[in-house]
Each structure stands twice: as C-alpha cells, then as structure tokens.
C-alpha cells in the first residue's frame, strides 16, 4: 500500500467530511478531490468505511 496515496485519499476524505455528512460523500468525490482515479481508491481500500478505518 503506497503511504502517500493512502494519505492523499485520507486527507481528501477528511476535507469532505468537514463540508458534509458521510452519507453524502462518494468514492468519486474523494478521488476527484485528490486527483486520483476510482481504480486507485479500490486498489488501496475496499470501500469508504475501510478508508475511515485507516484514518
């Protein structure tokens, strides 16, 4: 697991969580925020809840 990629995804998720509730955040929102693809997200995490566990 690339530490920089995971940190970028985590930072994007935290940033979005400051703006809106979790149920209004999609994987695409997270990947768009940090400039990565959905495939990259799913390479590192199973779903948003897996990412939250990382955070």
Model-derived segments and spans:
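Key DNA-contact positions within bacterial/archaeal DNA-binding proteins
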Residues: 39
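An amphipathic alpha-helix adjacent to DNA-recognition modules
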Residues: 3-14, 18, 23-27, 35, ...
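The alpha-helix within a helix-turn-helix
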Residues: 31
């Amino acid at each position: 697991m690339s530490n920089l990629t995971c940190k970028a995804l985590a930072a994007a998720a935290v940033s979005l969580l400051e703006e809106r509730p979790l149920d209004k955040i999609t994987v695409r929102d997270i990947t768009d925020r940090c400039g990565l693809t959905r495939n990259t997200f799913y390479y590192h995490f199973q779903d948003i809840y897996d990412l939250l566990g990382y955070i």
